[in-house]
Design a protein with these regions (language model features):
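Sec/Tat signal peptide C-region and signal peptidase I cleavage site
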Residues: 40-44
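Bacterial N-terminal signal peptides
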Residues: 31-39
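Eukaryotic helix-grip
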Residues: 45-223
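Generic detector of intrinsically disordered, low-complexity segments in short proteins
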Residues: 1-2, 222
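Bacterial N-terminal signal peptides that target proteins for export
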Residues: 3-4, 21-30
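Short polybasic linear motifs
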Residues: 7, 12
């Protein structure tokens, strides 16, 4: 998409200097400006900034359009087959052992290839804990790729007293086979925490979320 926009921009820019008609030049000028702004915006939204690389785990953050809160993405490789990782991700008995800052968790429903979880997340004083109902959708793309979509459903159950319901959560896990015994794991999320947590305070802390989650998950997978 970005390459296409850049090509259009280059064509318009070239036309701007070769067209002799004044009215046409003005139109091309404004069209060129609009395309440039759209292209710059698209590029900015897709640029992931590396913020941490340690213990074989890479973490990136990105500014999202229309939000003060950044998204995170983490990547790692594990010595394990895709199906073994999926088995761990689906195991409701151990999910609280690898989700970071998990204060409480309950499997609400299993439906076909979907799981619905209620999860309470611990936050440091003076902030109240957050909670959300998450829908995990397990999708086998092909024999070498598996995706888990993670979507928050804030209205699924009534809010609990003393806990702030998150406004929005959305992300996914992507498992890609590298060879018969190695899998690349990508974990990406964007969260709107709700309440009165300023973005300047929240954004630096999101780096630890995927990093700690990956470390704990890898320890379980590679036991």
């Amino acid at each position: 998409m970005n390459e296409f926009c850049i090509l259009i921009f280059a064509f318009l820019l070239l036309s701007l200097f070769t067209v002799n008609n004044d009215r046409m030049q003005k139109r091309l000028f404004w069209i060129t400006i609009i395309v440039l702004l759209l292209t710059s915006s698209a590029l900015a939204q897709e640029n992931w900034k590396p913020v941490k690389e340690e213990a074989g785990i890479k973490v990136y953050t990105k500014t999202e359009s229309g939000s003060e809160y950044k998204s995170f993405k983490a990547e790692m490789k594990v010595n394990c087959k895709i199906e073994n990782i999926v088995e761990v991700l689906k195991n409701s008995d151990i999910i609280n052992s690898w989700i970071v800052n998990c204060k409480g968790i309950k499997l609400l429903k299993t439906e076909d290839n979907d799981q619905y979880y209620y999860i309470e997340t611990s936050l440091p004083f003076p902030f109240k804990n957050r909670d959300m109902v998450y829908r995990f959708q397990y999708i086998e793309i092909n024999s070498e790729q598996f995706r888990v979509n993670v979507t928050g459903i804030p209205e699924y159950i009534k809010p609990r007293e003393g806990i702030v319901r998150m406004a929005k959560t959305n992300g996914f896990w992507l498992l890609s086979s590298i060879d018969t015994s190695t899998t690349a794991v990508t974990y990406q999320m964007h969260v709107e925490p709700g309440g009165l947590i300023p973005a300047w305070l929240a954004n630096p802390f999101i780096v630890n979320v995927p990093f700690s989650t990956f470390k704990d998950l890898r320890n379980i997978i590679q036991k």
